[in-house]
């Protein structure tokens, strides 16, 4: 017999992502419509351990769907990964009668969700990260907004770069996953895209590409560099010294996490939030909501965390950039040894 859920909690954990508020709103409204009570856990797993719990109703999520960030606040919590921290969290859940939990975050957040499920709290995860780096899903809450924010900023930088006939290096977020860099590189028409999954450190190839472009009459050269490669300022100095072309680095930073979520992030996050409540009501636990091959589905969290994900060769190749393509082939050669 499925466990009857009467009170659910919702928390956001790890890095914030635009669309978390629409997801929270959907969780609260769907749960209340099904006759459930909802508790909001502030500051992620820190708040769960420290009993920072609030009652939530439809009024508490009014006027938040268009807001960036998370009204529940978020944090990373090392204590929760300890046995003592998990014990405290379980006691807080018991105190408030929380028998179901929706966790919005990334891989680390889902490992925490597994611990809650082990403690007897039915738990459902929603993929909330701007990095698009969760292997089981083609969509993560916040990516669409983040990549559009970055694209618009790069368009503006490109305007001034062309006016001054500069080379510009734009560093975007993505420590281990280069999806923002890849998508912006294609959407902004960059000459080079440097991805953690692909780049082999060959700056000379980039320099040669810049010089070749200038000989052909190009008035600018745009390089999109993922955070995982970094060192954009030093790279700019070296490129300018080698080419004699004025080169500037811009690090977009945390602006990519902020801002009003796009229509897609509002819509998909809302569907995922509602889906999570449906799973809890059905007695499901330790599941991760995903969007795969055009459908909203759910996976066992253990299975989802064991999956791997890599940059699509097709998406990478349609950019038609010789330097970037060289990096791709080098990566594939190394992988096949």
Please describe what each predicted stretch is:
Residues 3-49:
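N-terminal phosphate-binding or glycine-rich loops at protein starts, especially the Walker A/P-loop
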Residues 103-105, 115, 143-246, 250:
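Accessory alpha-helical/coil subdomains and C-terminal extensions
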Residues 326-333:
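Conserved small/polar residues in nucleotide/adenosyl-binding loops
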Residues 48-103, 109, 141-148, 152:
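Glycine-rich oxoanion-binding loops at beta->alpha junctions
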Residues 246, 252-324:
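C-terminal active-site/capping subdomain that shapes the small-molecule cofactor and substrate pocket
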Residues 23-27, 108-121, 181:
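Short Gly/Thr/Asp-enriched flexible loops that form oxyanion-binding sites at enzyme active sites
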Residues 117-140, 194-198, 251:
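Short, acidic/small-residue loops that bind anionic groups at enzyme active sites
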């Amino acid at each position: 017999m499925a466990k009857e859920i009467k009170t659910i909690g919702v928390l956001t954990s790890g890095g914030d992502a635009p669309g978390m508020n629409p997801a929270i709103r959907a969780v609260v409204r769907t749960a209340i419509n099904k006759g459930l009570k909802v508790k909001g856990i502030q500051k992620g797993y820190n708040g769960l351990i420290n009993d920072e719990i609030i009652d939530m109703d439809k009024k508490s999520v009014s006027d938040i769907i268009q807001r960036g960030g998370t009204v529940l606040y978020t944090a990373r919590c090392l204590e929760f990964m300890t046995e003592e921290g998990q014990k405290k969290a379980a006691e807080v859940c018991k105190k408030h009668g929380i028998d179901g939990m929706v966790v919005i975050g990334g891989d680390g957040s889902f490992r925490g969700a597994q611990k809650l499920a082990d403690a007897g709290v039915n738990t459902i995860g929603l993929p909330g990260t701007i990095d698009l780096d969760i292997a089981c899903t083609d969509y993560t809450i916040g990516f669409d907004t983040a990549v559009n924010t970055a694209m618009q900023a790069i368009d503006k930088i490109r305007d001034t770069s062309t006016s001054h006939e500069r080379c510009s290096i734009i560093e975007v977020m993505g420590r281990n996953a280069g999806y923002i860099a890849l998508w912006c590189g294609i959407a902004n028409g960059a000459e080079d895209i440097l991805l953690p999954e692909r780049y082999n450190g060959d700056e000379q190839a980039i320099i040669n590409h810049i010089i070749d472009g200038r000989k052909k009459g190009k008035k600018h050269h745009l390089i999109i560099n993922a955070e995982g490669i970094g060192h954009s300022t030093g790279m700019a100095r070296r490129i300018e010294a080698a080419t004699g072309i004025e080169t500037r680095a811009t690090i977009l930073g945390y602006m990519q996490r902020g801002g009003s979520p796009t229509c897609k992030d509002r819509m998909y996050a809302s569907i995922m939030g509602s889906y999570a409540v449906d799973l809890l009501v059905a007695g499901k636990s330790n599941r991760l909501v995903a969007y795969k091959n055009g459908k909203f589905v759910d996976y066992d969290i253990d299975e989802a965390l064991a999956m791997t994900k890599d940059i699509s060769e097709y998406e990478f190749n349609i950019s038609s950039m010789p330097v970037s393509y060289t990096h791709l082939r080098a990566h594939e050669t190394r992988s096949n040894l």
